[in-house]
Amino acid sequence: MMDAANRAGVTAFTQSDPAGLERQVGEGGAMLSGGQRQAVTIARAFLGRPPVLLMDEPTSAMDNRSEMHIKHQLAQLKPSETLILITHKTSMLDIVDRVIVMEKGSVIADGPKSQVLNDLKQGKVRAVS
């Protein structure tokens, strides 16, 4: 549990609290910030070391420091672990190998990150009509 809490950045905000990990968080995490709630959710996902992690905007409410910590942790996944990341943040693309771009429910680009990003820059990817 401590490994998951450390990896997700939960201990970064609980270590300064006298209650530590026993701190009250309120119903639905109401006493936590949005970024703290995301850190707790990520810690729960890390707990079982699942072979596939599906994360939808996992750092959307985090500050830059917390996001960098999570990016570093996700970049450390083992080759046997797969991350499926849904994001609008281009900074999160640093940790992926493959990019799939979707628009209106259709795939408009799919391939190695460098190829897809290059195609997007050159206007080779067309929007769905």
For each feature predicted by the language model, list its residue ranges.
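Conserved "ABC signature" C-loop
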Residues: M1-Q24, G123-V128
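Catalytic Walker B motif of ABC-type/P-loop ATPase nucleotide-binding domains
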Residues: L53-D56
